[in-house]
Design a protein with these regions (language model features):
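A cross-family "folded-core" feature that marks the main globular domain of proteins
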Residues: 1-321
Length: 321
């Protein structure tokens, strides 16, 4: 999955062990060596290091090494998002990216001095995020003047997803004021949504009754983050089909609105959302049904899901809210 490049090598290995542990709670060293290119001793030391963190953070997962492999043990209160958050906080690569997004004018020299890391090392770490850049249709500027190149709306969407990663307890009420502030800050620094970009966004979501310029983007944030209750007329067929489906009778109108907001993100932006990234151990049958209804009732559904390979994960998340 695309976000794994944000982790350092050790943390990425632990995440892979966790993912393998979802299929079988015991993983042999042979399998881990093929997957992670680490020796058995290195994997054992990683497990011991994680035990120290787990004793303090209580995230609900432990990796217990033995002579032949690793046993993955989960407690009842285990949360995948909390594990990811703990691993992410250890990552210098993530810190560098976050700083660059928060302050687009910061230079590689300033980052080098602040973190006591060579300039080339910082550049290599940012280059190592190539899967992320490609997924969000962004790229690095070779001379590091602007560093991250691409549509401003895409950069803000990436910021939104990375901010969600830093809220493992899902306190999403802080997202709207944060995104409004960072959007205004970036605009004041000259990183604005251009007239051409506004036209591109409107062509992707023509049902929106406002222009997606800087002012319109503020209103879009309110919609995406649940402050504006609005369902376009083109979703009437979807709404009727959803409410008539016996398996979905227990869900309210608010759920339909949440689904539209999710669809709107898929329409407007490239890149996996955090809801798409986390894969539930067992998919709700209702989520799979919802995908089928969307394919039939949502206009141009195939077009805006073409670049999103894990849409059902998002449906699962929305239905469990």
């Amino acid at each position: 999955m695309v976000y794994q490049c944000l982790l350092e090598k050790d943390e990425r290995t632990l995440w892979r062990i966790y993912l393998l542990g979802r299929k079988s709670t015991f993983i042999s060293y042979e399998e881990l060596q093929d997957e992670c290119q680490f020796t058995a001793k290195k994997i054992q030391r990683l497990c011991e290091w994680w035990s120290e963190i787990e004793n303090e953070k209580k995230s609900g997962i432990d990796f217990v090494p033995s002579e032949t492999g690793v046993q993955v043990q989960l407690t009842e209160h285990f949360c995948e998002r909390i594990l990811w958050h703990q691993l992410l906080t250890q990552s210098l690569t993530f810190q560098l990216l976050w700083q660059k997004l928060m302050d687009p004018l910061v230079t590689i020299t300033q980052l080098s001095q602040q973190h006591y890391v060579a300039r080339k090392t910082i550049w290599r770490r940012l280059e190592g995020l190539k899967p992320l850049w490609q997924n969000f249709n962004l790229r690095l500027d070779d001379n590091f003047q602007n560093c991250i190149m691409g549509l401003e709306s895409q950069k803000r969407y990436l910021i939104l997803q990375l901010k969600k990663m830093q809220l493992p307890d899902e306190k999403e009420d802080v997202l709207l004021p944060f995104m409004k502030e960072i959007s205004a800050t970036r605009a004041n620094l000259g990183f604005t949504i251009s007239q051409m970009e506004s036209k591109i966004l409107h062509s992707r979501a023509p049902q929106l009754a406002y222009h997606l310029d800087e002012r319109g983007f503020q209103f879009l944030l309110q919609q995406l983050l649940g402050q504006e209750i609005w369902l376009p007329k083109c979703y009437e067929t979807f709404r009727v089909t959803f409410t008539d489906e016996p398996q979905l009778k227990s869900y309210s109108e608010a759920t339909i609105q949440d689904i539209y907001r999710y669809h709107l993100c898929l329409q407007l932006f490239c890149g996996d959302s955090i809801e798409e990234f986390f894969s539930p151990p067992k998919q709700l049958s209702e989520a799979i049904l919802l995908e089928s209804i969307s394919q039939k009732c949502v206009d141009k559904y195939t077009r805006f899901t073409r670049k999103h390979k894990h849409v059902v994960n998002g449906y699962d998340y929305v239905l469990k809210k």
